[in-house]
Amino acid sequence: MEEFKDQVVVVTGGSRGMGKEIVLAFAERGAHVVIASRKIEACEMLAEEVRLRFGVRALPVACNVSDWDQCGELVDAAYAEFGQVHVLVNNAGLSPHYPSLVDVTEPLFDKTIAVNLRGPFRLAALVGHKMVESGGGSIVNIGSVEAIRPSHMALPYAAAKAGLHVLTEGFAQAYAPTVRVNTIQPGPFLTDIADNWAEGAREELEAVVALGRCAEPAEVVGAVLFFSGSASSYSTGALLRVDGGWR
């Protein structure tokens, strides 16, 4: 519980779902948090909650990670406030629906790639570079089982998450030995994305995982803490499946 005390953790997509649970977990352990998402009001509400509950500092930042410049502004804001970042969690994601593959539009495709791949690239590049200068840190990417078990109804998303695996390997080599970069690959989680699943989708997913159920958002926390701290000191460029035993 003391390992992350007074460390600075940046979480994208941090105001809800898995991101919110990650923020709460680090704040409970004494870390100061930068909560980034598109909607500043939600970030501000969560920031106030963690200040009151855990007595840590919290910086809410409006950031659309698909915007190259906004990624830079997020990093600038974090370092202006805290002077250092110890952990970056690239959690923000987007998996839009479409009626069929032929109906995927260029804007939908580009937006999906931008949120799920371009944003994590830019943030890892900027923060990882600064981590090297300051002596080290950990970058944790949130991927998806879609990267290895793609559905035809989420192909742009799956392709972006597969690209995230490549970024993980590449950044792990680029910023070694002081910065570690790893990816968590969740299976079906009951986040906001699940609210838009088609009728019967949850039952279909639960039928193909060994544990027989979808995960709650907080069930990603253990893996994130593992990759962020000393327990994974010899892990970099690694991929950890948190998918309930996807068959």
Feature-to-residue mapping (PLM):
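Residue(s) in the substrate-gating loop at a strand-loop-helix junction
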Residues: 144
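Conserved glycine-rich cofactor-binding loop
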Residues: 8, 15-17
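Alpha-helical segment proximal to the catalytic Tyr-Lys
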Residues: 129, 172-177, 233
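Active-site helix of classical SDR
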Residues: 124, 160, 168
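The beta1-alpha1 cofactor-binding region of Rossmann-like NAD(H)/NADP(H)-dependent oxidoreductases
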Residues: 40, 62-74, 106, 218
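Short C-terminal tail/terminal secondary-structure segment
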Residues: 95-98, 149, 225, 236-247
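Substrate-binding pocket helix/loop in short-chain dehydrogenase/reductase
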Residues: 99-101, 105-113, 139, 194, ...
